[in-house]
């Protein structure tokens, strides 16, 4: 039986196993508090994320279960990896992952990025997205604060709490506004992996410019700012809008012409502009895919088709439409955690026997 110790962080009780010590707050989100800690077993520094009240409602239980399943499944150099998970005596859930020193949001607010760093960061974002998308997963909330970076400039995508299955009928109001793809605003119904490419394009533009590209004050203002730069959406895109109210709103806007991105990003490499234009396309069907972006000439210093793996198998989303009570989600969660530790123990036993 694991021994647990308690600590107070920002008025929140952290109840962790004695394997971890020296807790220091790193960040607070809507669904959890993250601390850095020392892993006394390995000697490395880790991030410990406490999921707040994971069993308070069926919706939160399902969200936590989904994030756990995704963290267990996704194994890629540019995606955050799970190193431990446990449930405390107070029935809080803790995810333990590798610790990276900072995130892209903090980097962007501290200083301008040099060209080679912009290239390398974008390459790693697209490399991670290629893998995630090939697993049948859409992140849905890609933004600078969800992109972690260490002192070696290694980059990892994190926070898959909003991630969803690839589904042409996907619904919902997700993603931080500045990085939200227009099809989420326009249709509220049909979107797919291309929303992540749009978000990556907004992040790319922010790295080039040093500030958010589309800093909308609200939903309507956000769309208006996008059209000021990219022009009015083509008719064939407008005709895909499912909501009559949204359709009337878009048709009521003044017609705008697309502005050349080169006129806004005057200091940027022409190849960077070319790739950005392919990422920020209104029509998701015409938007460049993550795998195609990797092969763009702008990223040629890093592109290696033999080292840009796709997922070996697609993620199993069979649970996603289930409407289950909290107790059932809790049992499923316990089962996943036991399975995780059994796999780890089996791997360790195999290593020791060799």
UniProtKB/Swiss-Prot annotation:
Domain Protein kinase: 20-299
UniProtKB keywords: Activator, ATP-binding, Cytoplasm, Kinase, Nucleotide-binding, Nucleus, Phosphoprotein, Serine/threonine-protein kinase, Transcription, Transcription regulation, Transferase
CDD domains: STKc_Sty1_Hog1
Pfam families named in the record: Pkinase (PF00069)
Active site: 141 (proton acceptor)
Protein's cellular compartments: Cytoplasm; Nucleus
Known EC number: 2.7.11.24
Residue numbers bearing the Phosphotyrosine modification: 173
Known cofactor(s): Mg(2+)
GO MF terms, alphabetically ordered: ATP binding; MAP kinase activity; protein serine kinase activity
Domain notes per entry: The TXY motif contains the threonine and tyrosine residues whose phosphorylation activates the MAP kinases.
Family, similarity comment: Belongs to the protein kinase superfamily. Ser/Thr protein kinase family. MAP kinase subfamily. HOG1 sub-subfamily.
Name of this protein: Mitogen-activated protein kinase hog1
Record organism: Botryotinia fuckeliana (strain B05.10) (Noble rot fungus)
Native organism taxonomy: Eukaryota, Fungi, Dikarya, Ascomycota, Pezizomycotina
Gene label: hog1
């Amino acid at each position: 039986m694991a021994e647990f110790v308690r600590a107070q962080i920002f008025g929140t009780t952290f109840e962790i196993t004695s394997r971890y010590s020296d807790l220091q707050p790193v960040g607070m989100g809507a669904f959890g508090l993250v601390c850095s800690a020392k892993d006394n077993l390995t000697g490395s520094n880790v991030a410990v994320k406490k999921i707040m009240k994971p069993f308070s409602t069926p919706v939160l239980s399902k969200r936590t279960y989904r994030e756990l399943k995704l963290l267990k499944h996704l194994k890629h150099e540019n995606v955050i990896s799970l190193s431990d998970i446990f449930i405390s005596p107070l029935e809080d859930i803790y995810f333990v992952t590798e610790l990276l020193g900072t995130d892209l949001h903090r980097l962007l607010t501290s200083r301008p990025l040099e060209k080679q760093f912009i290239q390398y960061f974008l390459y790693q974002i697209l490399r991670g997205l290629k893998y995630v998308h090939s697993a049948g997963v859409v992140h849905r909330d890609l933004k600078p604060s969800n992109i972690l970076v260490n002192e070696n400039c290694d980059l990892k995508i994190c926070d898959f709490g909003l991630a969803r299955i690839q589904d042409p009928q996907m619904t919902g109001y997700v993603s931080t506004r500045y990085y939200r793809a227009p099809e989420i605003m326009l249709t509220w119904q049909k979107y797919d992996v291309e929303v992540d490419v749009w978000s990556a394009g907004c992040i790319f533009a922010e790295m080039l410019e040093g500030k958010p590209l589309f800093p909308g004050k609200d939903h309507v203002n956000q769309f208006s700012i996008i059209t000021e730069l990219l022009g009015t959406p083509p008719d064939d895109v407008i005709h895909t809008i499912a909501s009559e109210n949204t359709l009337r709103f878009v048709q009521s806007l003044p017609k705008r012409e697309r502005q050349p991105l080169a006129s806004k990003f005057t200091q940027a490499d022409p190849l960077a502009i070319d790739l950005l234009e392919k990422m920020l396309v209104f029509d998701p069907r015409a938007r460049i895919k993550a795998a195609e972006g990797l092969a763009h000439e702008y990223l040629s210093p890093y592109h290696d088709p033999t080292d840009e793996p796709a997922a070996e198998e697609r993620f199993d989303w069979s649970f996603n439409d289930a409407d289950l009570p909290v107790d059932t989600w809790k049992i499923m969660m316990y089962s996943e955690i036991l399975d995780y530790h059994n796999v780890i123990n089996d791997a360790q036993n195999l290593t020791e026997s060799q």
